[in-house]
Structure formats: C-alpha cells, structure tokens
C-alpha cells in the first residue's frame, strides 16, 4: 500500500465548500501515479517503453463529505494482477481524524502504442515483477 497526501483546493468545491464528486476520480489517478513513481515506473517511463494502461472501469463509494481546506490521505493498493490487467483499490481518509471519506476501485489493461492489449509479463517483465511485488489483498476483505 502507498499513501498519497492531498490537500483540497478551493476550486474543487461548490458554494458550500464541499468537494465535487468528480474530483475523487482525479484523486485516484493522482494516487495511482504516485504508486507507480514509488515503484520506479512513473507514467513517463511507461510511455517511453511504449506501454499505456487505460482505465477499463472506475467506481467510487462516498462515505463522508470532504470540504475545503481538508487534507486527505489516499491509500492505494494493487489488489489484482494478471498479465493483461491490473486492479487498484483506494481508501480516502481524513489526514487528521482518520475518518473514512470514500472507497474506490479502478481496473486497467495494458496496451502498446497501437492500442493493442499486450501481456505485460512478456513485453516488460521488469515492470510486471515490480507490480507482482506490490500485490496485496483487497481492502474490502
């Protein structure tokens, strides 16, 4: 699990200073990018190696309101992995109170620059092994 610290910006909120629901998906992406940086495979490196990882599905369950100027910890875990697909799960918690604010999940495949699904174990075994080393049990279990 990797923990990504995120301060809420005023522009992400409505007139009641409540974070708009669409921003959580961005927070998941930021946390996932941080996760990849932590394992020495930032998106820039993957792009250089002609690999992309498009989102196949995304879900978010909102538990508690997030407001400006809250500070969040987005916990991201790789919970499922095979040669062509990866699943990440997220827990969004208040950095001070540790109150759970949201949970989420994203599923991704691996494609080459032509957009064709590829086996990451074959096309980039070092990246695949780095992911295998991070594989954890589901947050929901």
Which residues fall in each region the model found?
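Catalytic cores of transferase enzymes with a strong primary signal for eukaryotic protein kinases
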Residues: 15, 42, 72-75, 113, ...
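Residue-level recognition of specific faces of alpha-helices
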Residues: 24-27, 54, 89
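A broad, structural micro-motif
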Residues: 19, 53-55, 101
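HotDog/MaoC-like acyl-thioester-processing domains
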Residues: 2-4, 67-68, 79-141
């Amino acid at each position: 699990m990797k923990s990504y610290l995120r301060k809420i910006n005023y522009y992400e909120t409505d007139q009641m200073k409540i974070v708009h629901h669409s921003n959580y998906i961005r927070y998941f992406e930021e946390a996932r990018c941080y996760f990849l940086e932590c394992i020495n495979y930032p998106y820039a490196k993957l792009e250089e190696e002609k690999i992309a990882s498009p989102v196949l599905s995304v879900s978010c369950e909102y538990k508690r309101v997030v407001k400006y100027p809250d500070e969040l910890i987005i916990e991201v875990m790789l919970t499922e992995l095979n040669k062509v697909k990866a699943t990440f799960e997220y827990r969004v918690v208040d950095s001070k109170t540790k109150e759970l604010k949201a949970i989420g999940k994203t599923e991704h495949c691996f494609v080459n620059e032509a957009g064709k699904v590829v086996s990451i174990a074959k096309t980039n075994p070092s990246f695949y092994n780095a992911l295998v080393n991070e594989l954890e049990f589901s947050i929901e279990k």
